[in-house]
């Protein structure tokens, strides 16, 4: 009966060390990508920053870093081979993005988007790729109207109230000056023994009311027209972006 050959201890040890080296090398490049947990808010026309980092932190200068928008994977910004790949951007983001790489040596980058539009609202995905290993993180951008915090009624009240107070003050000063002027004129008339019609020095109440109210109505109407024009412009911009996304 032939005896079975047994592997020697050194060969088993070498095989184990080789397997351990392969496993450790396969896990050496792994990391996690971390983005903002809460939605990022921005106003139309402003700029916004979308931060992203890897954990544990490591130098990402030689990695491929980028942002894209699901579900069609439109490239928002791409960094590869140490350079920004502007030619691969979606047309609507060309010239509007900038990758802040001050802390890329620690695995931290930030995407800055200028001139925020209504069409920018929604999901963004940040990814880091190291050779064949890639991880990504999702984030959300909320785009808001500059006047989202105030209703039209409050806006009109805030604009009209100072004007109304000013007109009331002017009206009171006018009445006070009129009273003093009437007193001086009456004294002069008595001294000169001249007679005047008593209605000559009186100013009708409707003239005073008109003097106070008309300057208030003018700014109020102008403010309402300006507010409606601004909202129509923002709505038109939003519809134009929907018709021509590219």
From Swiss-Prot:
GO cellular component term of the entry, any: external side of plasma membrane
Keyword NAD applies: no
Keyword terms of this UniProt record: Cell adhesion, Disulfide bond, Glycoprotein, Immunoglobulin domain, Membrane, Signal, Transmembrane, Transmembrane helix
InterPro entries, alphabetized: Ig-like_dom, Ig-like_dom_sf, Ig-like_fold, Ig_sub, Ig_V-set, IgSF_BTN/MOG, Myelin-oligodendrocyte_glycop
Disulfide bonds: 52-126
SUPFAM superfamilies: Immunoglobulin (SSF48726)
Record topology, Cytoplasmic segments: 175-209
CDD domains: IgV_MOG_like
Subcellular location(s) of the protein: Membrane
Ig-like V-type domain mapped to chain residues: 30-144
Extracellular side: 29-153, 231-246
One GO MF term: signaling receptor binding
A Pfam short name: V-set
Positions of transmembrane segments: 154-174, 210-230
Annotated signal sequence range: 1-28
Principal cellular location given in the protein's record: membrane
Positions bearing carbohydrate: 59
Membrane topology annotation: Multi-pass membrane protein
Function: Minor component of the myelin sheath. May be involved in completion and/or maintenance of the myelin sheath and in cell-cell communication. Mediates homophilic cell-cell adhesion.
Family to which the UniProt record says this protein belongs: Belongs to the immunoglobulin superfamily. BTN/MOG family.
Subunit structure: Homodimer.
Protein's UniProt name: Myelin-oligodendrocyte glycoprotein
Organism: Pongo abelii (Sumatran orangutan)
Gene: MOG
